[in-house]
From Swiss-Prot:
Signal peptide: none annotated. Residues 555-564, 587-601 have a biased composition (Polar residues). This is DUF1769 family protein duc1. The gene is duc1. Interacts (via FFAT-motif) with scs2 (via MSP domain); the interaction is direct and serves to restrict the localization of duc1 to areas of cell membrane-endoplasmic reticulum contact sites, and away from the cell division site. The keyword Cell membrane applies. The modification Phosphotyrosine is found at residue 374.
Length: 791
């Protein structure tokens, strides 16, 4: 027997679906809903619309435990609130032979996952249903093509969406769930005023209504019994059933609503109003009051020349220069590890080299956990080689304690404890103390020596017996951060002193009188000293953390001795032909004080500054125009914050493009994402969304579906294998096919319909097992082949 998957606007009007073909979703245009539906089935070996060989699998299932997925996007043709649309399974008749204990156990598990689920055995068509807005695994939205220019979007950063499954509750035969367990589902007609304000309510956060908690507390995470093993990507578009928390966070473009809503009235206010009087906007049930002045300052729209990093959690409209590019990425999650050359936008010169090495996202040091920063070059190379290898038993600290390091017989916790040198707080305190010491060195050599003595005494107290390991980790971490985060800032004038990155590496590096040298303090006798060329008027740059903001030039090593820092010299080799002596930071600081003996002279267009201990030569422009620092170039650090536009693949299903826009998921590397900012005004997890809409009928009735919005959902499960109809959920392991057909043949039918009318159906997806030579299927396949020949 083979699996037949059919899709239609109701049970009487269906067609065979192209299973696992991302570029061929089934188009549905009924009286209540218009949209596209895509079905994926693992190890599919069933019927195709034209009788061609089936596509057995999809990239979607790689690294996941899911057995099937239903993905639907579309628009409602009527006005509904959140309580008037339900989704679930509906049968043709009652299943009399299904074990009662198994049914009760299954319903308890279903209610544990989705608290709003309910069933009715004795209805004309028995069903197991739940409110659509509460039960789907992911929910997102974007504006219809006719309202695209009115959209308000924002770049959102959120935790990784979680795994497929979670630990299941204990099962006993006395457990049962019915309609009586839930609040009444009778729909109260909407008032006239509510019907008028449908558009406003759809984009405003209903959680601010009286007696509704503003931010529901997510339940505590529980260990998963079935691991997801999603090794494909940095992030996953899974359901939100929490397992172990993941380190990484992802960024995506989110749809917040329409600009004509009172919620976004501040976006139409001029950007600069210095002394505007406090004028309050029109208020509604779900909109807070904002003054014009506060809206113009803290919530003003982003300007065209504003840095990309400022886009995070900021609302932008069609006035933004890249709006048309970003609005096409709404609701999409790209899995960059499936294609190492696709990930995030970076600088034009930097990005190509970074992508070749398979690094698509550089983490932010300030948001990164301390233990995640202890990487070495050896670990990085080894991880790149093994990133596609599957491992059954992964060490969660494998990036920190890589087996190839051969660090000894230390246990993982003990080794991590030894490697975690100091906390961020102590590092910041040390940085502040270094700043004070540097300022003291500027005025007195004696005070510099005193500060050095105190610093040496402090290092003795904090030193650890792992100096070689510290240096290995430190140098690897600095090199990794330096290579991917920094570009050299050029000092140029109007006369045209210009230099590229490649030319600078080849040219001689001259020493400026205002050069700053920096010594990174570590609890070890070995120090890493970095120096860089900078404007003499610039202030000293402080290293604030393990991989803080560092200059992009040379790195040298000096050994601490009993000689005061002011008497030590360091040598820099710029080229094989030229060797320039440079002083330490103490002497450079002293040279800038009034007591320093500096004799500036002009020789052939160059400035020569003579001191007692060193001579420094610096190029000087021929013009009298003052040197100015150019505007910083956006490097990989800032550009990596913006998700790269997903590669669009044209779809064969384009008849509904005028109503829905182009199909966005023909690329198998793209998944629908959980994006509910249009509901709550900010990102909430799947569990928080489910908990909120399952908590009361009042919450569902205060959410409205907008006819100008395309809603996208995905529904999946790792428990049901439709190729065999084997159900495996918790203690339940049985084949449901024989029970379904004991009293007459019937398929498993998922549908979205109205709550009060079982005949008011938006769409259906049927799964059925049929014989290979089923006449109905053969006739439908022949009809499809004939249609394709004509077109």
């Amino acid at each position: 027997m083979k699996l037949k998957v059919s899709i239609g606007c109701d049970a009487q009007h269906t067609q065979i679906a192209w299973v696992n073909y991302e570029g061929r979703p089934t188009e549905v245009d009924g009286p209540l809903w218009v949209g596209r539906i895509l079905v994926r089935v693992r190890d599919f070996d069933g019927f195709t619309p034209d009788g061609s060989p089936p596509k057995r699998d999809s990239e979607y299932f790689r690294g996941r435990s899911r057995k099937f997925q239903i993905q639907a996007e579309g628009r409602f043709k009527k006005e509904y609130n959140g309580d008037q649309v339900i989704y679930g399974t509906q049968f043709d008749h009652m299943i009399s032979t299904f074990p009662e204990s198994a049914f009760r156990a299954g319903m308890r598990i279903a209610k544990y996952i989705d608290p709003a689920v309910y069933y009715d055995k004795y209805a004309r068509s028995p069903y197991i249903m739940s409110p659509f807005v509460a039960c789907v695994n992911t929910l997102s939205a974007w504006p219809a093509p006719s309202r695209l220019e009115d959209a308000v979007i924002s770049l959102v950063e959120a935790d990784s969406q979680e795994s497929d499954t979670e630990s299941l509750p204990e099962i006993n035969d006395s457990s049962d769930v019915s309609l009586s367990d839930l609040p009444s589902t009778n729909v109260t007609p909407k008032k006239t005023t509510t019907q008028i304000d449908v558009q406003t309510n759809i984009v405003t956060p209903p959680i601010t209504v009286t007696a509704v908690p503003d931010s529901p507390n997510p339940p505590a995470a529980t260990p998963a019994t079935v691991a997801d093993n999603d090794d494909l990507s940095i992030v996953s578009s899974d359901s939100g059933n929490t397992t172990a928390p993941r380190k990484n966070r992802h960024r995506y473009w989110s749809f917040a609503g329409f600009s004509d809503s009172t919620r976004f009235s501040h976006l139409n206010v001029p950007a600069a109003i210095p002394d505007a009087p406090s004028v309050k906007t029109e208020t509604s049930q779900n909109v807070s009051q904002l003054s014009v002045k506060s809206a113009a300052t803290s919530l003003a729209p982003v300007e065209d020349d504003e840095d990309d990093e400022l886009l995070l959690h900021r609302h932008i409209t069609n006035k933004h220069k890249d709006f048309n590019l970003h609005v096409k990425q709404l609701g999409l999650l790209h899995k960059p590890s499936l294609d190492l050359e696709e990930g995030y936008i970076m600088d034009e010169n930097y990005g190509k080299d970074v992508y070749k090495h398979g690094i698509s996202n550089v983490p932010d040091d300030e948001n990164e956990d301390d233990l995640q920063r202890y990487f070495t070059a050896l670990e990085m190379q080894q991880d790149q080689k093994e990133q596609h290898k599957k491992s059954k038993n992964k060490d969660p600290f494998r990036k920190i304690t890589h087996p190839s390091l051969h660090l000894g017989k230390f246990s993982t916790p003990k080794l991590i404890k030894r490697m975690s040198l100091r906390s961020k707080k102590s590092l910041r305190n040390d940085s502040k103390s270094d700043d004070v010491g540097n300022s003291t060195h500027r005025f007195s050599t004696a005070s510099a020596a005193s500060t050095s003595a105190v610093k040496t005494e402090k290092e003795k107290k904090m030193s650890a017996p792992r100096r070689s390991l510290d240096k290995l980790i430190r140098i690897g971490s600095l090199h990794r951060h330096h290579h991917h985060h920094h570009k050299t800032d050029l000092i140029e004038s109007d006369s045209g002193i210009e230099a590229s990155e490649s030319n600078r590496r080849k040219s001689d590096i001259f020493s400026f009188s205002g050069r700053n040298s920096f010594s990174v303090s570590r609890p070890s006798s070995s120090h890493s000293t970095l120096s860089y060329a900078n404007d003499s008027a610039s202030s000293a740059v402080n290293v604030a953390g393990e991989t803080g903001s560092l200059p992009p030039l040379r790195e040298q090593t000096s050994i601490t001795s009993g000689v005061p820092p002011s008497n030590r010299l360091k040598k820099h080799v710029s080229t094989p032909e030229k060797i320039v002596e440079e002083r330490s930071i103490d002497e450079v600081s002293q040279s800038n004080t009034p007591s320093s003996k500096q004799l500036p002279q002009s020789v052939d267009g160059k400035t020569v500054t003579a001191n007692a201990n060193s001579t420094t030569v610096a190029k000087q422009p021929t013009s009298n125009v003052a040197l100015t620092r150019p505007k910083p170039v956006r490097t990989a650090t800032s550009q990596s914050k913006i998700p790269k536009p997903v590669k669009h693949i044209p779809s064969d299903s384009n008849n509904l493009d005028p109503q829905l826009g182009p199909w966005r998921f023909a690329n198998p590397k793209v998944d629908p994402i959980e994006d509910n900012s249009f509901i709550f005004g900010e990102h909430k997890s799947v569990k928080e969304r489910r908990k909120y809409f399952s908590s009361s009928k009042f919450c569902r009735e205060n959410f409205f579906y907008d006819k100008d919005v395309v809603y996208c959902m995905s529904f999946f499960s790792p428990h049901m294998d439709f190729n065999t109809f084997n159900l495996n959920i918790g203690p339940i392991r049985l084949n449901v096919y024989k029970h379904l057909n004991s009293d007459g043949h019937q398929p498993i039918r998922y549908m979205m319909r109205e709550t009060d009318d079982e005949d008011a159906v938006m769409f259906v997806v049927e799964f059925d097992l049929l014989e290979d030579d089923d006449e109905t299927v053969l006739a439908e396949q022949a009809k499809e082949r004939e249609r394709r020949k004509q077109t």
